[in-house]
Amino acid sequence: MSTVGTGKLTRAQRRAAARKNKRNTRVVQPVIVEPIASGQGKAIKAWTGYSVSKWTASCAAAEAKVTSAITISLPNELSSERNKQLKVGRVLLWLGLLPSVSGTVKSCVTETQTTAAASFQVALAVADNSKDVVAAMYPEAFKGITLEQLTADLTIYLYSSAALTEGDVIVHLEVEHVRPTFDDSFTPVY
């Protein structure tokens, strides 16, 4: 016995029903990035309305057991006056080390200190290769400051237990900031 209205749905009706139910049939896989030290790393997405700018600073030659300071400079695309006023979110600092580097290498981002050796006492997070933590994440420390204040008031400090030659250590700085608005017209000077 058949009942009324149990006919087969057409393709258009099935698609309309699927749209109405909004069932997500896709399986979303997390993006796995190659870990910096050991274990599995997972990419952290930027907040909505934010983007992440990445730049590197090559370390100059450094003596053993001496803390050196590296100034933070903005990439060219963020150095306009309007982009310097963008608010900062989270900051990530990580170290790229050549295999020839031996001994402990530490790095941190803090407010500019009068003595470089005091920087690690006030740092909220330290990237340290001897502890397999070659990255330091600052989720709340610099939140709300502008990119201009980031470059003017903050400094990267690097300590090595062994002497370093130029290019042995590359410091990677990744800053999450409000997404910039780029100009879509030329300056009217003609």
Swiss-Prot record:
Its main location: virion. It is found in: Virion. GO terms for molecular function: RNA binding; structural molecule activity. Keywords: Acetylation, Capsid protein, Ribonucleoprotein, RNA-binding, T=3 icosahedral capsid protein, Viral nucleoprotein, Virion. The modification N-acetylserine is found at residue 2. Residues 11-24 have a biased composition (Basic residues). One of its GO terms (cellular component) is ribonucleoprotein complex. The keyword Lipid biosynthesis does not apply. InterPro entries: Bromo_CP. The keyword Kinase does not apply. Residues 1-24 are annotated as: Disordered. The N-terminal arginine-rich stretch does not seem to be the major RNA-binding region that allows formation of an infectious ribonucleoprotein complex. Belongs to the bromovirus capsid protein family. Capsid protein. Probably binds RNA and plays a role in packaging. This is Capsid protein. It comes from Cowpea chlorotic mottle virus (CCMV).
